[in-house]
């Protein structure tokens, strides 16, 4: 093998290594962004319903920590498939823009659903004094009536407005993040100096996916996370 050919092969390996870690950094950033938006929805709920707190000795910080814990379970459900596909593709040398665009659409669709539930939880809790749950699917048989009730109730307008504002901000942030990492990945051909073999990239991919699956499980105990894990005080709102 000539020195020139050897140098070309080394540069290709360098490029793929940095593409892999940039792809991982992008996915972690997207996952973290989702958790930030969900936390903002919780802040809105606390601001709107803080008068419903009955146990004033209970820690609000603990409530938020447990909230992020449960939000991370939901986020991991959404992230596990794009994480596996993107990292395994990058491990074997593919980190194209089309793949990241497809992943963005995946997050847009499922995040919109999750954010909708988070936005609806505030008026739902105010009315029923409990968090939103699967019982809302019973309303789908009365879709027209339910929609009329929601949009005619003026107190819901704020939450509908905030939903679209936060969703739009999330989408814009996702687009800017994707473009930023697109540029970084395109430039990595010229400045990468770290080489990681395909086998090691594959192992790292598997470990990260397993970590995401652990996030879905939510805990290290015999049983996965349950709703009862949220209860830490006598206040229904903080729980």
Where are these regions (language model features)?
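N-terminal-proximal low-complexity accessory segments that begin disordered
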Residues: 28-46
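Short, Lys/Arg-enriched N-terminal segments with co-localized hydrophobic residues
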Residues: 1-13
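Hydrophobic cores of alpha-helical transmembrane segments in multi-pass inner/ER membrane proteins
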Residues: 73-86, 161-176
